[in-house]
């Protein structure tokens, strides 16, 4: 790992192209490499995953080399301190016998770190893909009592009109994928932008959450 950091520093210092890079110019590469990690995981290829994780690490190292106010050592030190604080059941005297308790401790530690935040939505990256952002936002909404069930949302657009909606809902992730793809196909057929539509609904949900806080 130290050798990789040294290589990144040398490349940034001596390569005319790398030396001119900014964080903004590197951002698309980080997005692309992260997507390739996910693809390798989904493919179940350990060799591909090893390579793609290395590419993501390179982006981290190169961004640290570009930075003027911190080094990769600062990044690693801050990360270690944060993870120690968020795992008190490992590094301190807390006890966690279940995954649910681990999540409770994690969230408590994170809240303590982010005391300056005034909303549960602070820190949620708005640049996430719409589906991932929607799932994140719904989880944040639950924290302040703003709930939204799948059945209610389907009813709202009159896609399902039957009395017994439950049996019409997806029964697995595969079924959910079919449903989502069907909705995207519907949007395309009607000339709608599915991404824009979901982001618009997410913005409305964000307003509901902020009003509930």
Residue ranges and their predicted role:
Residues 1-52, 58-213:
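Flexible "arm" and connector segments at domain edges
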């Amino acid at each position: 790992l130290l050798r990789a950091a040294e290589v990144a520093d040398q490349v940034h210092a001596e390569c005319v192209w790398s030396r001119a890079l900014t964080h903004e110019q590197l951002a698309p590469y980080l997005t692309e490499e992260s997507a390739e990690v996910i693809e390798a995981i989904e493919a179940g290829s350990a060799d591909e995953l090893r390579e793609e994780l290395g590419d993501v690490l390179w982006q981290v190292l190169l961004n640290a080399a570009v930075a003027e106010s911190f080094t990769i050592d600062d990044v690693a030190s801050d990360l270690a301190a944060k993870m120690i604080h968020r795992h008190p059941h490992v590094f301190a005297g807390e006890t966690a016998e279940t995954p649910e308790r681990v999540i409770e401790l994690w969230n408590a530690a994170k809240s303590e770190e982010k005391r300056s935040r005034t909303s549960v939505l602070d820190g949620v990256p708005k640049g996430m893909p719409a589906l991932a952002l929607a799932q994140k936002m719904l989880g944040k909404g639950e924290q302040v009592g703003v709930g939204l069930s799948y059945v209610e949302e389907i009813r709202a657009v009159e896609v399902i009109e039957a009395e017994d909606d439950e049996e019409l809902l997806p029964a697995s992730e595969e079924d959910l994928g079919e449903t989502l793809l069907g909705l995207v196909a519907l949007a395309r057929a009607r000339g709608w932008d599915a991404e824009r539509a979901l982001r618009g609904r997410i913005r409305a949900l964000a307003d509901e959450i902020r009003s509930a806080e």
